[in-house]
């Protein structure tokens, strides 16, 4: 997959079929779009191109919170697995946001894009003025990819974030499909309270502004040096900032400074307030028992990355 940049390159290739979007999370809806892109490229003997953005368009247009489901690096790696011919990244700016739908279509045509795969409800161009009719009235071939519905809801990045915030990890993972929701962070020193009750945790400094699950304790897998370990992870607030801590089962190595991944599998319990360390230890002991039961009843496929 060849990476390009809209500001300094133009495609000189055989005809191209493309789709575009931010593709946050690469969820089931995105996966369906990608698969249809590949199918229609084979039928038409076109090369494939994914057109995406270096940041969420909403963060530029409306200054909304820029929380994401997937880090930039992981998004690129996931898209690369599909073996598309090109990945063309747009550096999204206020100037790009003012492009009309007609200007965007003209840019596609100028770069040898002959066909596109889109959702029937697509909106694009300045203030979302372009829609499916705009595309169909152009000289582009237009292929439609319908919404994917899971649990009676259209799969979207926004819906998945709502599920995570509501602590519905199993439904969020169903929408993501490819792998459970995963975050990455660097292990840093914390206040070491859990160590005093013999449950040392890895305190994460997150590498990306992730859309975190709601404040609670979760059953997770944690990856260290390319190996996955069963774990429990708590998301809490400290000094009004989200804090993520993971306890790895059967693990006693030094993690400080390491980059680790945490994969969320299921909700364990809501967070509780404890008046003393003895009560905290009793609860964590119970959590450990429930976590061990969970993994004993789960398929070994969970450990596959």
PLM feature spans:
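Glycine-rich, Lys/Arg-enriched anion-binding loops that position phosphate/diphosphate groups
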Residues: 140-230
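Short acidic-hydrophobic, aromatic-tinged amphipathic segments that line or gate anion-handling sites
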Residues: 1-10, 88
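Phosphate/ribose-recognition catalytic cores of enzymes acting on nucleotide-derived substrates
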Residues: 189-305
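N-terminal Rossmann-like or analogous alpha/beta NTP/dinucleotide-binding catalytic cores
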Residues: 57-138
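Residue-level signal for inorganic ion chemistry
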Residues: 27, 79, 116, 172, ...
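A short acidic, often aromatic-flanked loop/helix-cap motif at beta-alpha or helix-coil junctions
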Residues: 9-12, 94-98, 148-154
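N-terminal catalytic cores of NTP/NDP-binding nucleotidyl/phosphoryl-transfer enzymes
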Residues: 7-71
